[in-house]
């Protein structure tokens, strides 16, 4: 099939390469803009703290399940096949712009449970370092600047994600 397509349109192969190249350039450009670079550092820090142990991951899943149950009980969520799955926070990769977008979307989807887990680590962490890191992450995730950047980056990256998907 690939040979047939390449015979008819010899440049078709390069569209996929262009999509990957675009993602690499977007990641590189994001490191050049200090507020965006800082946002992704903070995002990764929060995800690292919350995903630091199996206990934290279990606590995150339990908090997410409780939130889904609560929202279903008050008719805030619709039910259906594949809806309301319990997931995990996605860590952004170093080379794929799409992974940065998935990381943002996963945090937005699990914002409440993530804040709850950070609160619990802050209060019941096993070391002072863990408690201190959770305290910093909790302040960060609840700051206006971070929340604004989170939603702004979701909107911007949603547009570029559609473009990258279309090129692949």
Go through each PLM region and give its residues.
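Alpha-helical structural modules in large enzymes and assemblies
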Residues: 1-168
